[in-house]
Regions:
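Cysteine-nucleophile active-site neighborhood
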Residues: 44-112, 116-117, 181-182
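A short beta-strand-loop structural module common to alpha/beta enzyme folds
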Residues: 24-34
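Extreme N-terminal starter segment of soluble prokaryotic enzymes
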Residues: 1-3
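Histidine-centered divalent metal-coordination motifs
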Residues: 78, 128, 168
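Acyltransferase
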Residues: 172-187
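Short amphipathic alpha-helix with an adjacent loop that forms part of the alpha/beta core around
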Residues: 35-43
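Catalytic beta-strand/loop cores that center a nucleophilic Ser/Cys/Thr
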Residues: 112-159
Length: 187
């Protein structure tokens, strides 16, 4: 079962539908609905931290849930990505440019399991005003995708199956998004 922690965002249900279409059952909980121990008791096979409004520290148990990536594969999308970076000590700040419903060209590190089988570059959908400051990326995390001007668009933990993407793989404006989510599910 894939557990989707919903940060009160309409994109959560796009993720729910796309991941569900890829096979595994998906359970959705709100970010203030359960404790970390209650989540552990569900024995999820993987966890997705959804997009959402605001800052990671204001998103219920989302930042605390990052620790579960030491036990099962974990993917953070947009706010979920920011929560991963912040949980390890990175700084979330205003993005260089507000990106709401815009596509950007991104360069992928194809050694990252999420980007297996993808071209070296691709278009992704962006809906965010906050981003991780590149000079504060914690040493535990490795940048695995960047915009052409160097803004971090994805990270991977160096030891655990923890991944974050600033962009929206569930959007039709991310043509390879379904492949990325399939790669995560197969992790």
């Amino acid at each position: 079962m894939t557990l989707l922690i919903d940060n009160y965002d309409s994109f959560s249900y796009n993720l729910y539908q796309l991941v569900g279409a890829l096979g595994p059952p998906v359970r959705v909980i709100r970010n203030d609905e359960m404790t970390i121990e209650e989540i552990r008791a569900l024995h999820p096979d993987r966890i997705i931290l959804s997009p959402g409004p605001g800052r990671p520290e204001d998103a219920g148990i989302t930042m605390a849930a990052v620790q579960l990536g030491q036990e099962v594969p974990l993917l953070g999308v947009c706010l979920g990505h920011q929560a991963i970076c912040a949980a390890f000590g990175g700084t979330v700040t205003y993005a260089r440019q507000l990106m709401h419903g815009k596509q950007s060209r991104v360069i992928f590190d194809r050694a990252c399991p999420l980007f297996r089988g993808l071209p070296e570059q691709g278009l992704v959908a962006r809906y965010h005003s906050l981003a991780v400051a590149a000079d504060t990326l914690p040493p535990e995390l490795k940048a695995t995708a960047r915009t052409e001007d160097g803004e971090i668009m994805a990270v991977q933990h160096r030891q655990y199956p923890i991944y974050g993407v600033q962009f929206h793989p569930e959007s039709i404006m991310t043509p390879e998004g379904k492949t990325m989510l399939k790669n995560f599910i197969e992790e």
